[in-house]
């Protein structure tokens, strides 16, 4: 059977640089690449924007095409103020790689970057793998009581925060163009499926689960009976306001003042909560919230196994791998019911769903899980069973190859 040549465009270098300890994002793409590259009927190329001089290599049967754009002062001055000029420079670099690899199918991971715009420049079929979606994320960018003014409160980083928000709005505008011009999508939640149909009604959607990092497949299941006396709650978030640092602080304060729980709330992925502390008037140190920064996947896996529950605080999300990883090791998960999360959690069966910005209900559910071991164990067992099926590597590879075959046949 003739090989299908597939060219990936990714936001990370995937397995191009082995040994990097990525924590937030990208790890599942590396896992998918490793498994897919073993299939004899697929020839895989991977392209991404990187720093320095590009070094095209072939490793473990995968061709890597790092992309660079002219970053000279002269070039920057020429492009200054012209987003379209910047995009043209990047599109030219992307088209050069496409001509070099000559793929049957192009697989773009995410709509956050420029890669999805290439549908207007080529006749090769392009499938976009939906990840986070900027347009609905922009709608939830400021949590209740937050506004653009709060960007000015972010100490020395306020200029960076303002630039980030402006860039986010520009990316949302570009994402609209990308979604409207794409005929094929891959996704994994009812939410991303519906949004793809809103913007491209005649498009074809393929369900495709995501692989997790290896540590979570290999981990021994979570056991409630081995946990310590001090209640451990774990969350992983990033810096945007919509990730819900304020909800963590408010929930922790309610646990402190309204319950007798002796707890520590460990928050990974960030180094400070300054803005959330200012907005809520709650200092993390006063409510037993400990900010742990970025850690490796193996360290996170160990931390989760020592925790009584995982809490996801975001105001918008599609299918956060942090939830999936916690479910995979079989621990109880509490999450806001936003975006695509209801496709991951069945309330009171594989986890707990609650309205965003409801710290009272959050505190109540945490208390229930801690005080009712049978309930916690049942949630964890059900979650693990669901996650093992959802993240089955062979099933994911089968689904993705079926999608590639269908797309390739539709183009013949």
Predicted regions and their residues:
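N-terminal subdomain of nucleotide-sugar transferases
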Residues: 1-58, 62, 253
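Conserved donor-binding/catalytic core segment of Leloir-type glycosyltransferases
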Residues: 7, 224-243, 249-252
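Membrane-proximal helix-turn-helix segments that form the acceptor-binding/catalytic region
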Residues: 32, 134, 150-185, 198
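Glycosyltransferase donor-sugar binding loop
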Residues: 236, 249, 263-278, 293
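Nucleotide-activated donor-binding/catalytic signature segment of Leloir-type glycosyltransferases, i.e.
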Residues: 277-301
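Aromatic "clamp/platform" in nucleotide-sugar-dependent glycosyltransferases that forms part
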Residues: 315
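Short hydrophobic beta-strand element within catalytic cores of glycosyltransferases
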Residues: 332-335
């Amino acid at each position: 059977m003739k090989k299908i040549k597939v060219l990936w465009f990714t936001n990370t270098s995937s397995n191009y640089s082995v040994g990097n300890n990525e924590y937030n994002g990208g790890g599942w793409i590396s896992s998918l690449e490793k498994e897919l590259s073993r299939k004899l009927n697929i020839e895989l190329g991977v392209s991404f924007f990187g720093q320095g001089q590009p070094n095209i290599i072939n490793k473990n049967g995968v061709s890597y095409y790092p992309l660079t754009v002219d970053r000279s002062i002269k070039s920057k001055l020429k492009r200054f103020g012209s987003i379209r000029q910047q995009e043209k420079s990047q599109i030219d670099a992307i088209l050069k790689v496409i001509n070099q690899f000559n793929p049957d199918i192009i697989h773009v991971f995410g709509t956050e970057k420029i890669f999805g715009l290439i549908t207007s420049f080529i006749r090769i079929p392009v499938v976009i793998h939906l990840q986070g979606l900027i347009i609905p994320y922009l709608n939830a960018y400021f949590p209740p009581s937050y506004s653009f003014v709060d960007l000015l409160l972010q100490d020395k980083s306020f200029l960076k925060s303002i630039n980030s928000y402006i860039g986010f709005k520009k990316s949302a505008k570009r994402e609209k163009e990308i979604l409207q011009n794409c005929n094929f999508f891959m996704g994994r939640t009812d939410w991303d499926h519906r949004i793809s149909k809103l913007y491209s009604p005649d498009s074809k959607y393929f369900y495709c689960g995501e692989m997790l990092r290896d540590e979570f497949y290999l981990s021994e299941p979570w056991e409630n009976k081995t946990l310590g006396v001090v209640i451990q709650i774990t969350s992983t978030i990033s810096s945007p306001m919509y990730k819900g640092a304020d909800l963590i602080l408010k929930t922790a304060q309610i646990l402190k003042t309204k319950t007798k729980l002796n707890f520590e709330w460990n928050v990974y992925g960030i180094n400070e909560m300054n803005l959330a502390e200012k907005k809520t008037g709650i200092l993390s140190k006063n409510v037993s919230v400990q900010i742990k920064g970025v850690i490796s996947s193996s360290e996170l896996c160990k931390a989760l196994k020592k925790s009584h529950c995982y809490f996801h605080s975001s105001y918008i999300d599609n299918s956060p791998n942090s939830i999936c990883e916690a479910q995979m090791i079989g621990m109880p998960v509490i999450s806001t019911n936003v975006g695509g999360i209801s496709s991951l959690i069945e309330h009171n069966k594989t986890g707990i769903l609650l309205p965003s910005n409801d710290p009272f209900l959050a505190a109540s559910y945490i208390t229930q899980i801690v005080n009712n071991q049978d309930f916690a164990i049942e949630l964890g067992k059900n979650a693990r069973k669901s996650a093992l099926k959802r993240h089955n590597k062979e099933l994911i590879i089968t689904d993705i190859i079926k999608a590639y075959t269908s797309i390739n046949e539709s183009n013949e």
